[in-house]
Amino acid sequence: MTDYPIKYRLIKAEKHTGARLGEIITPHGTFPTPMFMPVGTQATVKTQSPEELKAIGSGIILSNTYHLWLRPGDELIARSGGLHKFMNWDQPILTDSGGFQVYSLADSRNITEEGVTFKNHLNGSKMFLSPEKAISIQNNLGSDIMMSFDECPQFYQPYDYVKKSIERTSRWAERGLKAHRRPHDQGLFGIVQGAGFEDLRRQSAADLVAMDFPGYSIGGLAVGESHEEMNAVLDFTTPLLPENKPRYLMGVGAPDSLIDGVIRGVDMFDCVLPTRIARNGTCMTSEGRLVIKNAKFAEDFTPLDHDCDCYTCQNYSRAYIRHLLKADETFGIRLTSYHNLYFLVNLMKKVRQAIMDDNLLEFRQDFLERYGYNKSNRNF
């Protein structure tokens, strides 16, 4: 039996859903699942220190291969002692493959069997990223969990295109496995693609499961499809993945999507959503989204969320935070970012307890009755 550097341990399966309580063991520590992972694109979660992330309860964070390759460079990070040392983070790190960022550059990229040619978004120079190069960069970064290089087709692409795409992604996954220099201390995940086509998702999953990765990601979702379409894909995709390995849904961070993903057996999630909307003054609360810049909060001296015990809510009022953001003070963004990250990490803590108590469906109903499926200011 293969001795993987990444191991999944099931603690409890929820009686009424596909949800599972567990933990993932990595070379830099163990974290509980289901877990939301804050995104630190440039080797930092925007405006948050490592100490703050630990206080929030972030057991693992994500960094971006594409951006770190371009700046400051993966070889420089390797010379510094690796990404953990470079950014002073001694807990697990997951890196993506760079594929999603490359495919976001739709107007300036060319896909071939060898890899992808694209324009550097910083200076316009021509760049080439292959499965082997994506693995080499991540080996230099030294992340605990790495991603295979894949193509992320748009959800509504034609069937024939998606079929060719997933077959190429499977070939790229095999090439990446062969190029992986550090299988003893870095776990490489395969990424299941296939847009909304069940037979293609089945084909992609079968190809990757046969390669025996230590974990599996579900890609190609949260790219414009409806919530119902995402759930339908998860319904037929997650059961295709091994029960004894981690399952990671990429790019998902809306609270309702997190809970529905857990119900369908997903263990890990990431998204830039909490910090991105925080910078615009949008805060997640137990009563829905709150747009703190609105004038009605100018003399509101209550916390962002009456049910939240995070540092922001314990110490600062809506009026003060609104003032900071209106005055373009960075501290305001720090406070809203901290709160939103805490909200999602703490939500997953509550979800884990609901799995333990076998009442996740009731928890979902109660939560969404108050939160309101991401509708802004539902009860304000």
Swiss-Prot record:
The protein's enzyme class: transferase
Transmembrane portions of the chain: none
A Gene Ontology biological process term: queuosine biosynthetic process
Region listing for RNA binding, in residue ranges: 251-257, 275-279
Pfam families the UniProt entry points to: TGT (PF01702)
Catalytic residues (positions): D96, D270
Catalytic reaction list: 7-aminomethyl-7-carbaguanine + guanosine(34) in tRNA = 7-aminomethyl-7-carbaguanosine(34) in tRNA + guanine
The protein's Enzyme Commission number: 2.4.2.29
MF-aspect GO terms: metal ion binding; tRNA-guanosine(34) queuine transglycosylase activity
Residues where substrate binds: D96, S97, G98, G99, F100, D150, Q193, G220
Entry's cofactor comment: Binds 1 zinc ion per subunit.
Gene3D superfamilies (alphabetical): Queuine tRNA-ribosyltransferase-like
Domain of life: Bacteria
Sorted UniProt keywords: Glycosyltransferase, Metal-binding, Queuosine biosynthesis, Transferase, tRNA processing, Zinc
Quaternary organization: Homodimer. Within each dimer, one monomer is responsible for RNA recognition and catalysis, while the other monomer binds to the replacement base PreQ1.
Similarity section: Belongs to the queuine tRNA-ribosyltransferase family.
NCBIfam families in alphabetical order: Q_tRNA_tgt, tgt_general
Role according to the record: Catalyzes the base-exchange of a guanine (G) residue with the queuine precursor 7-aminomethyl-7-deazaguanine (PreQ1) at position 34 (anticodon wobble position) in tRNAs with GU(N) anticodons (tRNA-Asp, -Asn, -His and -Tyr). Catalysis occurs through a double-displacement mechanism. The nucleophile active site attacks the C1' of nucleotide 34 to detach the guanine base from the RNA, forming a covalent enzyme-RNA intermediate. The proton acceptor active site deprotonates the incoming PreQ1, allowing a nucleophilic attack on the C1' of the ribose to form the product.
Name by which UniProt lists this protein: Queuine tRNA-ribosyltransferase
Primary gene name: tgt
